[in-house]
Amino acid sequence: MKKLGYKLATVAVGALLTATTLTACGGNNPPAASSNSSSGPAVKIGLLLPETKTTRYEAFDRPLFEAKIKSLGNYDVVYSNASQDASKQQEQAESALTDGVKVLVLDPVNAQAAASIVASAKAQDVPVISYDRLVAGTTDLAYYISFDNEQVGVLQGNALVDKLAKDGVKNPGILMVNGSPTDGNAVLFKKGAHSVIDKSDVKVLAEYDTPDWSPDKAQSFVAGQITQFTGQIDGVYAANDGTAGGAVAALKAANVSPWPIITGQDAEITGIQRIVAGDQYMTIYKAIKTEAELAATVADQLAKGETPSDATDVAGVPTKLLTPVVVTKENIMDTVVKDGFYTVAQICTTEYAKACAAANIK
């Protein structure tokens, strides 16, 4: 079986991406009200995020975006979080448009339903940046910023398959706990993972698309499969750290042994701590600072009537895809700590101090 050689990205990757961040060339439209001037009313930028169950949005995406956009000019951010409710997000978008936002940065709850938000914005000549998740069924987007989401699934799948092989597990069986079926990114994670798993000797015992990315629903699913597949679960493909946490809770409650190999994504602090403790094998680290600041830079350019460059065409939409990185116990120091995403003190709380020392995380 072909093994994946992980190329560990450190802060240099983020710096490179930031350094090559879009340079603008003048568009045909006159610039909007000067957003670099401190005089006059602030230019409003809408930021619509999808949910709060994943900690990244409130802890990282929002504050990083707001700090960057305000450093670029006289901007006010009109912010809303939809709490995984597509109808609520539609209302929030209409409210932001009524409030006079000049650019809308949208991370959709439902990729298909969000096309109507884009249509409403277009009718008012407000450009939309599709952030992290691609709005489906429309080419009326000014820009799309995300990570290579199919590659995320490939990295997760390779990590799981390779670890099972390295551990000498014969005829391994796994559960697949995918993300929300209404999240376009989750579809790509699943596709990428299957492209690896389906070619391996790993058997998928059962598979579940987790509504709303709910850790509780992931836990319930895994708990049910433990009873059905007693002694057969060698691994769990969990699409993110939230669903991984649900899987871990179910497995611990059932005292499953030997412990399965469990994947994840988002490099949440709880996910990193589970990796340190040996409860989770890996996660996917995304340089959210780079992504959020890039979105702010593009929003600034669009607000000024400029045309962002340095993009590739994806389904008719100017796109910038960033690079995801595998994190295991062995490279925590070289990734999330070195990049300043977390400090050792944040990871190595009292509960995890001994595990951190054993893993040389200090």
Residue ranges of model-derived segments:
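Sec-dependent signal peptide hydrophobic core
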Residues: 5-17
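A residue-level marker of the well-folded mature domains of exported/periplasmic proteins
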Residues: 2-7, 24-362
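Bacterial Sec-type N-terminal signal peptides, specifically the leucine/valine-rich hydrophobic h-region
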Residues: 18-22
